[in-house]
Amino acid sequence: MKKKYKKLIILCKGDSVTGGSELVHQFCHELNSLSLDSSIAYYPLSEKYLVPEEYSIYDVKLSKLEDEHDNIIMLPEVATKFAYKIKTAKIAIWWLSVDNY
């Protein structure tokens, strides 16, 4: 089966240790364990972040927001404002909350 994308980049708030942030790290870890190229880009995008110590158990790669044709950029519902910055990549919105927006 041919992959329909080159890389999945999941946007996550930097320095955030919450249930939603942990879910993003778990998801990225599981995709990588299945040999699917996925990474996390922390925002604000102008800052540099490290993976929080609490999430060091997850195998995740960090990347920049790579707005390329073959990429998918997944945004949490609280960061849909970044959709306007993405011109080329495909966009997916992951609704991590039950009733928050």
Annotate the PLM regions.
Residues 1-72:
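N-terminal pre-catalytic "stem/leader" segment of glycosyltransferase-like enzymes
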